[in-house]
Regions:
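Residue at a conserved register position within TPR or TPR-like alpha-solenoid repeats
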Residues: 29-32, 87
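Generic helix N-cap/helix-start motif at coil->alpha-helix transitions
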Residues: 21-25
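Extended glycan-interaction surfaces of carbohydrate-active proteins
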Residues: 1-20, 43, 49-107
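Alpha-helical positions within canonical tetratricopeptide repeat
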Residues: 39-40
């Protein structure tokens, strides 16, 4: 956690650079939800909001402390999808949320 998490900002995609991505952060949220740690999962999902643009899409990454978006202007479908899956895993809003529950394999 200490290597990759930038508290309140997100999850780094590499350990030695000061940038976080919404997708890495959402994927970490999914992992926490899958093991039942919904508090941390919710915090991580909240951290992705800094990446959200006015049109609802998500910038791929943010460099800190400069707040530069990288790659410049990039808003990928996989980033939005990761955020949606994390939200669903936490809230169980759709049947797909069961994919991330520890009991899914037993169903």
């Amino acid at each position: 956690w200490d290597t990759f998490a930038m508290e309140g900002r997100g999850i780094r995609c590499v350990s030695d650079e000061p940038w976080v991505t919404a997708a890495e952060t959402a994927e970490c949220s999914l992992a926490h939800a899958a093991v039942g740690d919904l508090s941390t999962a919710t915090d991580l999902l909240y951290w992705t909001r800094a990446h959200r643009t006015d049109d609802g899409s998500y910038m791929t990454g943010i460099v800190y402390p400069s707040f530069e978006h990288f790659p410049a202007g990039e808003r990928t479908a996989y980033t939005g999808a990761a955020v949606i899956m994390a939200a669903d895993a936490i809230t169980a809003s759709s049947p797909a949320a069961k994919l991330f529950l520890p009991t899914f394999a037993a169903d």
